[in-house]
Each structure stands twice: as C-alpha cells, then as structure tokens.
C-alpha cells in the first residue's frame, strides 16, 4: 500500500496540471472576435494588379465611357460625399449599415451618401439578385427603402435556397407594383446597372466589401467598422473645409 501511494500522488498531480492547462488554453469571452473585427469580404483576387492606385477613375481603361448609376441620399449641398461599395449579403456590410445610419442622422447637413453595387458573386449566391431587387425597386422610386430592408433583414434571405419569394414579399411590403418589379428584376437594363457599378468599382481598386470613400479617398476598414473612428474622420474632413 505504501508503494502505491506515491504513484497515486504523482498521477493526481499530473491530472491537475493537465486540467489547468486546458483551462488556460480555452479562449475567454473577451478574447473572442466580435463582428467589428471581421475582415472585409473580398473577391480573393487582386483587381488592382497593374493599375496605379492613385490614378483617377477616368484614366482607367475598364471604366472608360461608363457613367456609374449613382443613388444619393442626403442634402444636395452637403460638403462631404460618402460612397459605399457594398454587397447586400456581405455580413460586414450588414454590420456597417447601422453605423452609416447613425452617421447620416448626426451629420445630416454635412454628409451625403451614395451606394454602389459590388456583389461578390463567387461567394454570395443571393447577392447579385439582391442588388437587382434594389434596382428594380429604384425604378419605382424606392431604392433606399429596399436598400435598408435588405440590410436590416439580411439574415432572413442570406442563406435562403431561393431568395426571390422573400424579395417579392419585400416589394409588397414597400407597396411596389409586384408585377412590374418581377419583370424588372430580370431585365437587361437592371442587370447592366449592377454590372456598371462593379466595373467602375474594380477600376477604382475595390476588391472587397464594404469599401468606403469619403470625398474620393478610401477610408480604412478599421475606421468604418468603428462608429467613433468614422465620426472623427468625418469631423476632421468638415474642419478641413472651414
């Protein structure tokens, strides 16, 4: 019995040590990444290869003779233009949406917002159709209403095997002519509008979403995913214009 006692003690010590190590290796709640720490959703390719990132959009061959379809919200005399290249199915874009809404509310007189489509077709199966849904709504004067609904209800349709019925439901909720909406969502003009945005975005160096420009200059991702940082960047731009 005396010979077995040291062995039992040694085994007990080893078990305690292993348990302690396991607890140390388990990530704490504070160490888990939150959505704000998510990287932007990217195409996985470098769309700017061979291009001068400082060159104006007009000088880039891919954007030649293409007038981007611009959806604007805000005062026409606002001194700042904030442009978003977004994908309605992109989770970081969904996270950015309420941040942008707060910015619009706080800087109503100073900031005008523009949205450009950049659906990541190879990653998000419903993204391109969502972009067309927004454009079909735009033909009935309700682009921004559909834009907001798509982001705010992103989880409802993002992984749906067939998103069309969901989008038709949104059209009804917004009071759209559903028959016209159904025709427009698959029309060539609507598809071309989305592709025009993608082409111009690629020419500007966009490779992921959300990508945001403030008065023509790209805003770092770590800034746009933090309300206080984005607010400070806007205040700095406003001060520079005084």
Describe the residue ranges of each PLM region.
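C-terminal cap of thioredoxin/glutaredoxin-like
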Residues: 1-40, 168-242
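Juxtamembrane proline-rich low-complexity "stalk" or linker regions positioned immediately after a signal peptide
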Residues: 31-62
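Short, surface-exposed alpha-helical recognition segments that flank or form part
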Residues: 57-58, 91, 185
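A short beta-strand-turn-helix
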Residues: 63-80, 105
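A generic local structural motif
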Residues: 67-70, 99-100, 198-200
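Short clusters of hydrophobic/aromatic residues that line enzyme substrate/ligand-binding pockets
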Residues: 72-73, 157, 219
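Alpha-helix initiation/capping motif
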Residues: 75, 122-123, 160, 183, ...
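Structural alpha/beta surface segment adjacent to cysteine/selenocysteine redox centers
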Residues: 78, 83-89, 94-172, 177, ...
């Amino acid at each position: 019995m005396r010979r077995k006692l040291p062995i039992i003690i040694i085994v007990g010590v080893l078990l305690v040590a292993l348990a302690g190590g396991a607890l140390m290796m388990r990530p704490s709640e504070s160490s888990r990444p939150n959505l704000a720490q998510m990287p932007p959703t990217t195409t996985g390719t470098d769309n700017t290869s061979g291009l001068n990132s400082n060159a104006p959009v007009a000088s880039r061959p891919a954007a030649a003779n293409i007038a981007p379809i611009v959806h604007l919200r805000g005062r026409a005399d606002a001194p700042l233009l904030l442009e978003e290249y977004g994908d309605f199915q992109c989770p970081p874009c969904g996270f950015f949406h309420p941040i942008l809404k707060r910015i619009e509310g706080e800087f109503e007189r100073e900031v005008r917002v523009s949205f450009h489509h950049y659906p990541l077709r190879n990653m998000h199966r419903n993204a391109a159709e969502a972009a067309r849904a927004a454009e079909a709504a735009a033909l009935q004067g309700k682009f921004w209403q559909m834009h907001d609904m798509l982001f705010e209800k992103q989880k409802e349709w993002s992984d749906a095997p067939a998103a069309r019925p969901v989008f038709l439901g949104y059209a009804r909720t917004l009071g759209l002519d559903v028959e016209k909406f159904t025709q427009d969502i698959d029309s060539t003009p609507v598809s071309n509008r989305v592709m025009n945005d993608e082409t111009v975005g690629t020419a500007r160096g966009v490779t992921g979403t959300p990508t945001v420009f403030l008065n023509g200059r790209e805003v770092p991702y770590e800034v746009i995913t933090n309300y206080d940082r984005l607010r400070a960047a806007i205040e700095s731009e406003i001060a520079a214009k005084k």
